[in-house]
């Protein structure tokens, strides 16, 4: 009898523990604090305040959006702007790269401009996109470059992209040396520390706490971004919503493939405008 009582008590304790875990997990997934100011949690997503979730997409006219994003008829959208990067010389060494086997080299970048935000469906003119503020993905580097040419720009070179993310101080993350948290970068959404069950990126520019000192957003996470390598090939930089570990989000993170993918987007770079 005593064994039955102990066994029954153990089962009850396990059920209670499981219920607590499920409650906490559900609360974290719907906790408004996980979404930046101007957005609120709707299931696995962060939608503009006043919106609801329909078919996995944020729907309705938002009453409020994060700083830098404007309310539109179908959601919050980043207002395109360019950021001037003054350029300079960046020396990379094994210490800068945490002894990851990267050879010491020096990068010199001249002044250029770069989009503050990833290119969105609204800016791209996508037809039938469920949310205009989401970044464009599943586009080849050539198609992305063609769009940038129409805008008077091009894809950034790998060195330009790196310099925009690290600055001359070789920042580990675009905002600084530490502090990779969910409020600064959109990562690990599918599976990982910021997991909500989402299956795609968040709104471009929705994490203002993760911007670089120059004011460039989403250089870590959300979508990886095309940049041109010295041999004219293209590779995706910076990690994405699928990235699960810090090493995939650091400023020097580069993916090996050259194919279009649902976690790869882009932004454009430009020659500097006259002062």
Language model feature labels by segment:
Residues 39-42, 51-54, 69-71:
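Extracellular, cysteine-rich, disulfide-stabilized repeat modules with beta-strand cores
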Residues 26-38:
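Ser/Thr/Pro/Gly-rich low-complexity linker/stalk segments immediately outside membranes or between
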Residues 74-142, 221:
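A short glycine-rich, aromatic-capped structural motif
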Residues 85, 91, 130, 137-262:
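Functional-site microenvironments in short loops/helix caps that host divalent-cation chemistry
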Residues 4-10:
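Short, hydrophobic alpha-helical membrane anchors of single-pass surface/secreted proteins
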């Amino acid at each position: 009898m005593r064994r039955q009582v102990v066994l029954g008590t153990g089962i009850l304790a396990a059920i209670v523990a499981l219920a607590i875990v499920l409650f906490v997990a559900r609360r974290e997934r719907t906790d408004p604090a996980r979404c930046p100011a101007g957005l609120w949690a709707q299931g696995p997503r962060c939608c503009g305040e006043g919106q609801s979730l329909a078919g996995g997409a944020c729907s309705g006219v938002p009453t409020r959006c994060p700083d830098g994003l404007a309310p539109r008829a179908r959601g919050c959208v980043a207002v395109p702007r360019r950021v001037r990067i003054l350029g300079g010389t960046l020396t990379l060494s094994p210490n800068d790269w945490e002894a990851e086997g990267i050879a010491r080299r020096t990068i010199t970048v001249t002044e250029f401009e770069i989009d503050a935000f990833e290119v969105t469906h609204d800016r791209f003119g996508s037809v039938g996109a469920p949310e205009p503020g989401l970044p464009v993905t599943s586009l080849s580097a050539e198609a992305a470059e063609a769009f940038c040419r129409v805008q008077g720009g091009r894809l950034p070179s790998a060195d330009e992209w790196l310099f925009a993310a690290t600055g001359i101080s070789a920042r580990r993350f675009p905002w600084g040396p530490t502090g990779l948290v969910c409020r600064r970068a959109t990562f690990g959404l599918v599976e990982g520390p910021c997991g909500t069950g989402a299956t795609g990126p968040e709104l471009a520019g929705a994490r203002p706490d993760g911007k670089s000192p120059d004011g460039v957003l989403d250089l870590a996470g959300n979508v990886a971004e095309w940049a041109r390598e010295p041999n004219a090939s293209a590779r995706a930089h910076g990690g994405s919503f699928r990235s699960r570990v810090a090493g995939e989000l650091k400023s020097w993170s580069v993916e090996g493939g050259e194919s279009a993918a649902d976690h790869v987007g882009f932004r454009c770079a430009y020659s500097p405008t006259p002062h």
